[in-house]
C-alpha cells in the first residue's frame, strides 16, 4: 500500500478500522491518513463494497428495476433507496464494462461475424444499438449510436477490432448500404461481406436478451445512461 497523496511507501497500518471494517493507514512522510478503499469510487459510501457490487451485478444481469433491488435487499436486512442503486450503477458500470472488454481480448473468436442493429428509445428518440456475434454465438462487441450511417458503422467495426484484437474472414449483415464501405475501411479489403437476412437470423434472436432487460426499465433519461447500461449487460 502506497500513500495516495505523496506516493510514498512509508505507510503504517493503524490499529483501528473504519465503520465498514476496512483497514486504516497513515503515511509517515506527509502524515495523511486513508483506508484501503480511499482510492476507489465507493470510498464515501456507507455500505460494504461486496454488497454494492452484488446490487449492480443483479441490476445488469437480471430484469430487475431499481425498486425491485431495494426491496429485495430490504427483506434481507439491508436498507437503501432505489436512488442509491442508480448512483452505484452509474459509478460501477463503466469500470465493469471496461474490465470485461479488456479480458475479452484473450478469447479466441470464430472467423465469421454476424452484425446487426436494433432500436432503443432514449428520451422519446430512436437510437441504434450495433451488435456483433461470431459463428458460435459469442459476443464480439456492442455500441449505441444516435445515428445509423456510415460514420457509426465505421466506428463500430473499429471498436470491435480494437476490443478483440482480431479481424474476421467474413462478415454477414443486413442490406444497409453503409456496411460495405465501413467493412472495407475499418477491417480491410480482404474481408468477405455477405448480405443475407436469413443468415443473420441468429443475431436477430440474440437481440431479445438485451431488449428484455431494457423493457423493464421504462426507457432511458439520457443517451449517456443508455450507452452505459447497454455496454455492460451485453458483456455479462
List the predicted regions and their residue ranges:
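Short, cysteine/histidine-rich loop/knuckle motifs that typically chelate Zn2+
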Residues: 5-8, 29
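Basic, short loop/linker segments at the boundary and entry of helix-turn-helix/winged-helix-like folds
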Residues: 16-60, 81, 87, 104, ...
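Short conserved beta-strand segments at catalytic cores or DNA/RNA-binding microdomains
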Residues: 60-63, 123-139, 148-149, 157-158
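Two-metal-ion RNase H-like nuclease active-site motif
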Residues: 109-122
